A protein has these predicted regions:
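Conserved glycine(s) of the Walker
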Residues: 13-14
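Switch II (G3) loop of P-loop NTPases
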Residues: 95, 99-103, 107-122
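Extreme N-terminus of proteins, especially the signal/transit-peptide cleavage junction
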Residues: 1-2, 106
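N-terminal phosphate/diphosphate-binding loop that engages ATP/GTP or pyrophosphate donors
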Residues: 3, 17-89, 93, 98-102
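Conserved glycine-rich cofactor-binding loop
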Residues: 10
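Hydrophobic anchor at the beta1->P-loop junction of P-loop NTPases
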Residues: 6-7
């Protein structure tokens, strides 16, 4: 399986747009592809759930109900700050483990979208 990490210089620089386009491109080329957004901040609360627009866009592009996110944070700041504030020890090995879950392994290609900009320490 091949994986690509999608990052950018800042938040709102077009990572989700590019991820969505790549999912559509690879699907058109008959390549089984899944987009993942393991960590997201700036979420909206809906009852007991958090919703993140980027996660929703990628899930729609995936045409799948697989959970592509494991860490959602309400505050619109760098996820490592929010995680530390909440006592969550979010480490890169945890994110890598999430991206290697069995349900993602049947795909030929994983597109993993980062959170925030290039220098976010996750």
């Amino acid at each position: 399986m091949t994986s690509f990490f999608i990052t950018g210089t800042d938040t709102s620089c077009g990572k989700t747009y590019v991820t969505r386009l790549l999912i559509h491109y690879f699907r058109h080329k008959q390549i089984r592809c899944i987009g993942l957004k393991p960590v997201a901040s700036g979420c909206e609360r809906h009852g007991d759930d958090f919703i993140n627009e980027d996660v929703e866009i990628i899930m729609q592009a995936n045409q799948s109900n697989l959970a592509i996110n494991n860490w959602l944070f309400e505050q619109p700041v760098s996820p490592h700050f929010v995680a530390a504030d909440k006592g969550i020890n979010l480490q890169s090995k945890d994110i890598v483990s999430f991206c290697h879950r069995p349900e993602f392994m049947s795909y030929q290609l994983r597109l993993i979208e980062g959170a925030g900009g290039l220098m976010v320490p996750l």
